[in-house]
Amino acid sequence: MADTTGRIPLWIIGTVAGILVIGLVGVFFYGSYSGLGSSL
């Protein structure tokens, strides 16, 4: 955690972005499967 004083490491950005993408895709498919995604 000592490297957070400067630029944010790319692996942290990649991990956060990956989690967000997986979460959004999961919510999208879950909503479509349960019928709630039709309003999106």
Swiss-Prot record:
Database matches in InterPro entries: PSII_PsbJ, PSII_PsbJ_sf
Keyword Ubl conjugation: no
UniProt keyword tRNA-binding, yes or no: no
GO BP terms: photosynthesis
Protein's membrane topology: Single-pass membrane protein
Localization: Plastid, Chloroplast thylakoid membrane
Domain of life: Eukaryota
Keyword entries, A-Z: Chloroplast, Membrane, Photosynthesis, Photosystem II, Plastid, Reaction center, Thylakoid, Transmembrane, Transmembrane helix
TM helices/strands, residue ranges: 8-28
Cellular component GO terms, alphabetical: chloroplast thylakoid membrane; photosystem II reaction center
Principal localisation: plastid
Family, as annotated: Belongs to the PsbJ family.
Subunit structure of this chain's protein: PSII is composed of 1 copy each of membrane proteins PsbA, PsbB, PsbC, PsbD, PsbE, PsbF, PsbH, PsbI, PsbJ, PsbK, PsbL, PsbM, PsbT, PsbX, PsbY, PsbZ, Psb30/Ycf12, at least 3 peripheral proteins of the oxygen-evolving complex and a large number of cofactors. It forms dimeric complexes.
Protein function: One of the components of the core complex of photosystem II (PSII). PSII is a light-driven water:plastoquinone oxidoreductase that uses light energy to abstract electrons from H(2)O, generating O(2) and a proton gradient subsequently used for ATP formation. It consists of a core antenna complex that captures photons, and an electron transfer chain that converts photonic excitation into a charge separation.
NCBIfam families reported in the protein's UniProt record: PRK02565.1
Annotated protein name in UniProt: Photosystem II reaction center protein J
Organism name: Helianthus annuus (Common sunflower)
Gene (UniProt): psbJ
